[in-house]
Amino acid sequence: MGEHLWMCVGLRSDYAVQQRDGRYLRAFRPLSSALLSAHLAGRLTIGTYVITAEGTCSFAVFDADRSDGLAVLLDVQQLLAEQGYPAYLEQSRRGGHLWLFFAQPTPAEQIRRWLGPIASARALELYPRQAGGKGIGSLIRMPFGKHRRSGQRYPFLDRELRPVAPTVAEQVAWLAQVERIVPPDLPQVSIPAHRSSSTQWVAHGRSIREWNAQQDPFALI
């Protein structure tokens, strides 16, 4: 089942492990399918470095760590859908993530040239956070892993902010259905206007705890 998670991996030659305080410790060794399975089982939580050694990315993520984060990301999701680019919403501890998956490795500089203005207009973080260059770059927690500080897992959500599948195992299988896109190679991108959105995530903490309580950890081993 962990094989589906490879599409959420950036750099394969290294990774990081989340500690109890939420920070990450670099592993300095390659990632493996066994480690991805351990991530799903909750034995450890993996952070993946978004940019590869070649300066490319297989995905991009908008990060909104704030109370209205899911509503803002839904707006971005709709904007991208209108342009023909599907994106996938994931809840996080303090807001949400919006993932785009690419059909082929794409230069980080190209991704930031395309999506950077959208992120800046809404005060969102964008991964990749760098346009390439030296260094290992920034990392992001891989989906479905147990956040070591909150003790919770966070699901992918549909437009109504409901989990796309009732169990983690089914959510992982759902990943095989997501559409991979070819990003545009644009010299510059105009910044879209803000939209108002009334979508709210009600009872965030309680809903996540209830969803986690329904999971069978042995089904992920």
Task: Outline where the language-model segments fall.
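Catalytic micro-motifs at enzyme active sites that drive phosphoryl/nucleotidyl and oxygen chemistry
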Residues: G47-I51, Q77-Q78, Q83-Q91, L124-G132
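Helical (often loop-to-helix) elements that flank the catalytic cores of nucleotide-handling enzymes
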Residues: V72-E82, F101-L126, R148-E170
